[in-house]
Amino acid sequence: MAGRGKVGKGYGKVGAKRHTKKSLKETIMGITKPAIRRLARRGGVKRISSLIYEETRNVLRSFLENVIRDSVTYTEHAKRKTVTALDVVYALKRQGRTLYGFGG
């Protein structure tokens, strides 16, 4: 058993787990009800209708799609493969939502 650590008998190699792509429905449900509630509390909301949660997820998804699309456009124009913080800042500025504190 030398050289195998705590693995055991060593029947073949086990590689690293690969990331599997979750479906969009699964991913958007990752924005939990308590997380939406915390955001609403920060905005000063006292009571929340049960219909709000799904609508909030849809609005957030469309907002992020727009920001990410613009960020990737800036990245591709600069002939890079990595989206930087400045790409996101410029994408938000383009949509009229200026973000301070990240350069630019």
Swiss-Prot record:
- Mind listing the UniProt keywords for this protein, alphabetically? Chromosome, DNA-binding, Nucleosome core, Nucleus
- Annotated Gene Ontology MF terms? DNA binding; protein heterodimerization activity; structural constituent of chromatin
Q: Which residues form a coiled coil?
A: none
Q: Where is this region: Disordered?
A: 1-21
Pfam families, alphabetized = CENP-T_C
Question: Subcellular location, in the record's words?
Answer: Nucleus; Chromosome
Cellular component GO terms held in the UniProt record? nucleosome; nucleus
Q: What SUPFAM superfamilies does the annotation carry?
A: Histone-fold
Among InterPro entries, the record links this protein to: CENP-T/H4_C (IPR035425), Histone-fold (IPR009072), Histone_H4 (IPR001951), Histone_H4_CS (IPR019809)
- Similarity comment text for this entry: Belongs to the histone H4 family.
Self-association and partners = The nucleosome is a histone octamer containing two molecules each of H2A, H2B, H3 and H4 assembled in one H3-H4 heterotetramer and two H2A-H2B heterodimers. The octamer wraps approximately 147 bp of DNA.
Q: What does this protein do?
A: Core component of nucleosome. Nucleosomes wrap and compact DNA into chromatin, limiting DNA accessibility to the cellular machineries which require DNA as a template. Histones thereby play a central role in transcription regulation, DNA repair, DNA replication and chromosomal stability. DNA accessibility is regulated via a complex set of post-translational modifications of histones, also called histone code, and nucleosome remodeling.
Q: Which PANTHER family match?
A: HISTONE H4
What protein is this chain from? Histone H4
Organism of this sequence: Sterkiella nova
